[in-house]
Each structure stands twice: as C-alpha cells, then as structure tokens.
From Swiss-Prot:
Biological classification of the source: Eukaryota, Viridiplantae, Streptophyta, Embryophyta, Tracheophyta
Protein name (database record): Copper transporter 3
GO cellular component, as recorded: plasma membrane
Species assigned in the record: Oryza sativa subsp. japonica (Rice)
Name of the gene this protein is made from: COPT3
Major subcellular site: membrane
Keywords: Copper, Copper transport, Ion transport, Membrane, Transmembrane, Transmembrane helix, Transport
Compartment list: Membrane
Length: 150
C-alpha cells in the first residue's frame, strides 16, 4: 500500500511461478486504452501484430452479430414452445447465446477501445439486420423487443 500515489494506467500481473524468470512482463489494463498491443480472451492473442489485432476485432464484430441473430424473432419463433423437441432446441439455443454473450463480455474486459467499438458496431449491425427487419423477420409494429440482458 506504500505506492498509493501512483496513477499508472496498468497494474502489474502477479509474479510468475518458479522457473518463469525468462517471461516477459505483462500488464492488465484497468482503464480504457487505445492500441493494438493487447490480449483478448487468450494469453498472447492477438499480440503485437496489426493484422492479428484486425482479425480479433473482426471476430468480436462477428460474435456480436451472431448474438443478435440468436436473439432475433426469426430464431425465437422457429423454436417456439410446442413439442418437447422444440423446447429442448430453444433451451440449447439459449444456452449457446448466453455462453457467447459471456465470451463477448470477457473480450470487453480487455478494456481496449477498439474491441468496445467492434462489439457495439456488431450489435448495431445485427440489430439492424435481424431485429429491425432489414433482412425480414423483425418485430411487428407495437411489439417491444426483449431487453438485451445477459
């Protein structure tokens, strides 16, 4: 607690276990930052490569679009309550959707502004395509969309 006056934007990770003397020092950001040198979901990924960072942003964008598709009326109506098989399918789709939502949340916990913008853009594009009716199957007039909550 002697270093309370330090106002750095990163916090050093816990020291490596025995035998890890040759490891590089990693930082866990505690505030939003802009830069391609980040770790999203996995240690060392995407690394310092600009191309891998762009791929990571594209993956986050696609994941957000997929989440909007899985929550769209088209998917919800196709697995509406009926037979046991349809209810089981609806439960499986819901489980996949929640799992992917948590994965997206973990990606956002990298505190990288690019990841945040990719996720918001993906949700907006997915909403426009699947929920607002651009690709058909949107909500009818006067019908409210369910809250986008985990």
């Amino acid at each position: 607690m002697a270093d309370m006056g330090r106002h750095g934007m990163a916090m050093a990770m816990a020291p490596a276990a025995a035998g890890g003397a040759g490891r590089r020092k990693r930082y866990m950001h505690m505030t939003f930052y802009w830069g391609k040198n980040s770790e999203i979901l996995f240690t060392g990924w995407p690394g310092a490569s600009g191309g891998m960072y762009a791929l990571a942003l594209a993956a986050v964008f696609a994941l957000a679009v997929l989440l909007e598709f899985l929550g769209s009326p088209r998917v919800q109506e196709s697995s509406s309550l009926g037979s046991r098989r349809r209810r089981a399918t609806a439960a499986a789709v819901h489980a996949v959707r929640v799992g992917l939502a948590y994965l997206l949340m973990l990606a956002l916990m990298s505190f990288n502004v690019g990841v945040l913008l990719a996720a918001v853009a993906g949700h907006a594009a997915g909403f426009l395509a699947f929920r607002a009716g651009l690709c058909g199957g949107g909500y009818k007039k006067g019908e409210l969309a369910p809250a986008a909550c985990c």
